[in-house]
Curated annotation (Swiss-Prot):
The lineage of its organism: Bacteria, Pseudomonadati, Chlorobiota, Chlorobiia, Chlorobiales. This is Imidazoleglycerol-phosphate dehydratase. GO terms for molecular function: imidazoleglycerol-phosphate dehydratase activity. PANTHER family: IMIDAZOLEGLYCEROL-PHOSPHATE DEHYDRATASE, IMIDAZOLEGLYCEROL-PHOSPHATE DEHYDRATASE HIS7. One of its GO terms (biological process) is L-histidine biosynthetic process. The gene is hisB. GO terms for cellular component: cytoplasm. Belongs to the imidazoleglycerol-phosphate dehydratase family. Pathway: Amino-acid biosynthesis; L-histidine biosynthesis; L-histidine from 5-phospho-alpha-D-ribose 1-diphosphate: step 6/9. HAMAP family: HisB. SUPFAM superfamilies: Ribosomal protein S5 domain 2-like (SSF54211). It catalyses: D-erythro-1-(imidazol-4-yl)glycerol 3-phosphate = 3-(imidazol-4-yl)-2-oxopropyl phosphate + H2O. CDD domains: IGPD. Pfam families: IGPD. The keyword Amino-acid biosynthesis applies.
Amino acid sequence: MTQRIASHSRKTAETDITATVNLDGTGTSAIETGVVFLDHMLTSFSRHSGIDVQLRCSGDLDVDDHHTVEDVALVLGKAIEEALGDKKGIERYGWAIIPMDEALARCSIDLGGRSYCVFKAEFRRPVIQGLSTEMVEHFFISLSRTMNANLHLAILEGQNTHHLIEALFKSLAYAMKQAVRVSGTRIPSTKESL
């Protein structure tokens, strides 16, 4: 099987980002975004999805976290999309319901090439360790856009902001683990193209 590894970079006046992913990795990561809680979430995503992620970002955090969070998602999504190649043999779909103490999150994903994100969650705290919680939804929207994925995320239960966000990232991780898994030899579509 061809190695499913890809790198993608983006440099603007606001951010300078490089990401490398290995879809058939062991969940190792080296994440540096400058946003402590985002680093924690991406490390958790890597560990639980089994996708190796190397990501470095230098952003205009003196302004706020918006550009960094958005651009990290755009670059990570594009690297994953490129690593998927022609998507021959992948499961394509993945889903997970993940608890974290009182929090319960659900994620369903379709890697079929149609970008759309539905996000249903509310957070009590406006900021957690440098991450504006309003940017969590924007992260997933941006990720789905460049990953060309249909992504549905929802909080089913919970109150603690840390637990809610971490459960969302872990549910994405387990859904991705399933969706990128190679289990056949054909493109998983009646169109024979994704």
